[in-house]
A protein has these predicted regions:
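Short, low-complexity N-terminal intrinsically disordered segments enriched in polar/charged residues
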Residues: 1-27, 31, 123-124
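Flexible, glycine- and charge-enriched loops at secondary-structure boundaries
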Residues: 2, 42, 46
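Hydrophobic pocket/interface hotspot
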Residues: 12, 24-25, 32, 45, ...
Length: 124
């Protein structure tokens, strides 16, 4: 992996939080990007993915991103635990998530898988 790959996931998160779509695009592979969402939805391609994020996140009032932890499994795979907060119908909401990032040989993000954390029925 090239030096480009170092810190790419962190830069992606910074750009996402700032709604810096051009900056975000620099962290994503030009070819072969696949984003799998928590509802089994799939977005393919860098341009489609950036356009999708721009549409969804700019329409959420009060959108905030709080990164709890970034865990690098190796130079290609990272997990990020975070919460996204926003206002829906005047009511504040927070969604805890875990996102899996995979990076290609060029160090850029080529795979994104989003998982929601669900509240349980009690302690185990």
């Amino acid at each position: 992996m090239t030096e480009v790959g170092a810190g790419v996931v962190e830069r992606y998160l910074e750009c996402l939080a700032a709604h810096d779509w051009d900056g975000l695009a620099t962290t994503i592979a030009d070819d072969g990007l696949t984003r799998e969402g928590p509802f089994c939805d799939v977005v393919e391609g860098k341009q489609h993915y950036v356009a999708y994020l721009r549409k969804v996140l700019t329409n959420l009032k009060g959108h905030r991103l709080e990164v709890k932890r970034v865990s690098h499994v190796n130079e290609r795979v990272s997990y990020v635990e975070l919460s996204e907060s926003f206002v829906i119908d005047g009511v504040p909401a927070t969604w805890p998530e875990c996102i899996l990032f995979e990076q290609g040989d060029d160090g850029l993000i080529s795979q994104v898988s989003v998982f929601f954390k669900q509240p349980g029925g009690g302690t185990a």
